[in-house]
Amino acid sequence: MADRIHWTVGQAQALFDKPLLELLFEAQTVHRQHFDPRQVQVSTLLSIKTGACPEDCKYCPQSPRYKTGLESERLMQVEQVLESARKAKANGSTRFCMGAAWKNPHERDMPYLQQMVQGVKAMGMETCMTLGTLDGTQAERLAEAGLDYYNHNLDTSPEFYGSIITTRSYQERLDTLDKVRDAGIKVCSGGIVGLGETVRDRAGLLVQLANLPKPPESVPINMLVKVKGTPLADNDDVDPFDFIRTIAVARIMMPSSYVRLSAGREQMNEQTQAMCFMAGANSIFYGCKLLTTPNPEEDKDLQLFRKLGLNPQQTATEHGDNQQQQVLAKQLLNADTAEFYNAAP
């Protein structure tokens, strides 16, 4: 196995500065060396706990600091989550991601989260969660339940980060990724394009990700979805070619990682998405909503796949374990009280 490159910001920026077609050729070449270029991994993301998040991320409508009109919702019952997972699997998703608007999960939440993971795993789907900061014990408990991936984005470069978020440090995010990795869970971590960052900041984000002790298995690249009421609602639109460049550089710097088109696809036309796949994207979120912002409908995605000759990737455990599902159905936990599901303060 070839030695990994320890990337510098200068090296990453040099990739961004390449002529676009030359960059795309290099990215597609790298992509074909590590993946089947016709296969796209398909995930579905469900918000299992919406709003009332104590963080101040300037892009996010889930913070009560901003008047966005978003109504907060308590943690979903386990069976509700599993029903959504069944629908996602029927529609072609192979990974089910569950997101909660918390700074961190509390001890009282853990039994419910563990049952969600166990139930989705029993269907033969891969599991992913994004719950905020984790401690080592929480990561281990989720791993024991069978969690495959944990998402915790770095969002942007260390230098620009403080302009976007003040309630959680960059180091806290890196520490959570370390705890996830130590627990044996695969890492999903990426960032957002369009926060007001420079190209050097985009390079800095990708350097942070690529230089982790082990690069993330999954790297979601989001385009800012501007939500009225958030501080970034009036940001300039992202040039599609700048976004495509970011995908291409991510592919070159993290050749074995899945690079996912995440939030913002609703704003992209088919041509832009096609160029992202050419640049090395090989994973998407599939369905009508990403947490609280729009996403293309499933049938539009399938139509685009047919036009481009792409195929949804299948998993080895797609049939699931019916016996395990029946056992879990008898054990599902329900809320003890209405207050049980309040967001972590």
UniProtKB/Swiss-Prot annotation:
Keywords: 2Fe-2S, 4Fe-4S, Biotin biosynthesis, Iron, Iron-sulfur, Metal-binding, S-adenosyl-L-methionine, Transferase. Its EC number is 2.8.1.6. [4Fe-4S] cluster binds at C53, C57, C60. Residues 38-256 form the Radical SAM core domain. It is an enzyme of class 2 (transferase). GO terms for molecular function: 2 iron, 2 sulfur cluster binding; 4 iron, 4 sulfur cluster binding; biotin synthase activity; iron ion binding. Pathway: Cofactor biosynthesis; biotin biosynthesis; biotin from 7,8-diaminononanoate: step 2/2. [2Fe-2S] cluster binds at C97, C128, C188, R260. PROSITE patterns: RADICAL_SAM. The keyword Transferase applies. Its cofactor is [4Fe-4S] cluster; [2Fe-2S] cluster. Binds 1 [4Fe-4S] cluster. The cluster is coordinated with 3 cysteines and an exchangeable S-adenosyl-L-methionine. The keyword 4Fe-4S applies. One of its GO terms (biological process) is biotin biosynthetic process. Catalyzes the conversion of dethiobiotin (DTB) to biotin by the insertion of a sulfur atom into dethiobiotin via a radical-based mechanism. HAMAP family: BioB. Homodimer. Belongs to the radical SAM superfamily. Biotin synthase family. This is Biotin synthase. The gene is bioB.
